[in-house]
Amino acid sequence: MSLGAKIAVSAMRGIKKTGLIKGLSADLDAELRKAKKYNRKHPYARLCESQNRGVKAVKILIFGAGVIGSLYGALLAEAGYNVSVYARGRRLESLTQDGLLYKRKGKIRRASVNILSRLEAKDCYDLILLTVRENQLHAALEELRQNVSPTIVTMVNSLETYDRWEAICGVGRIIPAFPGAGGGFDGNVLDAALTPRLIQPTTFGKTGGRERALARVLHQAKIPCQIVPDMRAWQLCHLAMVVPIADAYYEAADPEHAGRDTALMRKTAKQIRDNLEAIAARKIRLSPGKMQAFRLLTTPLVGWILGFVFQSSFGDRFMYRHSMKAPDEMLRLHEQFYRWLEKKAI
């Protein structure tokens, strides 16, 4: 076994013994075996070692400097992590000139991050948060194929299977996730926030133990998160809800005030319910469990609730802004989701 693999195994055994990251047990043992098998330092060991040295030792790359990437980058930098942001085009120009500006508690702050215009194959990060739109995902994964960083957290709304992504960037690198955040830009200043913990924390799936190391990073930055047993099921249920919500904005005569249209809200409620019923009929467990409410409550009641949410500041920040900013992405997701339902019905 090479020196690198021996160091990885030794470090991970020490972490298990001291309880640095709780609850690893069988998952950690499996990772140790992988480190031996592949005769190299395992990505899980690398992240754990960096965490053991302190937050400044953990290198994080934000790949995609839109609303989501900028917010996570700012919050992680606030927590002391070594954060770099990879951007292009006008966003790169803005970041290079002014830095990553964001609103926080009524004040404008500048995040302590490194701004990158290119990513070299040898540039190694403990975590890469991939925060691009669904229709940009494949190109981003292609670019990351040659990079040596071991772990890519895909914070993307998509219906594709994760093995398809790993076929592009490399097996064992993906942690499938979804952000719990929303907002927009006021000029070049980020005006965004995390979604409330009870509604939708940052969510990611189980990946043999690495997800717990990721959770520790987010907890350190006070970013609420949850680990779900079946991320694929979670994303299907999420699409079952957000696709009809986006459709409602596009169908409304006055999208900004779509929540005032009672008939449209009831139609949206019925479509969400039908979508979740179709998923459940395919023996897929609804995730999170609160999705069951759409099936149990009456359509008029759910429609009334949706109308209230659409007209709230929450709806404006976390629903309206994204739907109106990314209609091409939402149309693609609409087509993918209903094509999947039709295919599964055959």
Language-model features: locations:
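Rossmann-like NAD(P)(H) cofactor-binding subdomain of soluble oxidoreductases
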Residues: 107-190
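Rossmann-fold dinucleotide-binding core
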Residues: 163-238, 244
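Hydrophobic anchor at the start of a short beta-strand
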Residues: 60, 83, 152, 174, ...
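NAD(P)-dependent Rossmann-like dehydrogenase/reductase catalytic/cofactor-binding core
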Residues: 277-346
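Charged/polar low-complexity intrinsically disordered segments
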Residues: 6, 16-17, 34-36, 51
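NAD(P)+-binding Rossmann beta1-loop-alpha1 motif at the extreme N-terminus of oxidoreductases
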Residues: 56-108
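Active-site-proximal catalytic alpha-helix in oxidoreductases
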Residues: 232-276
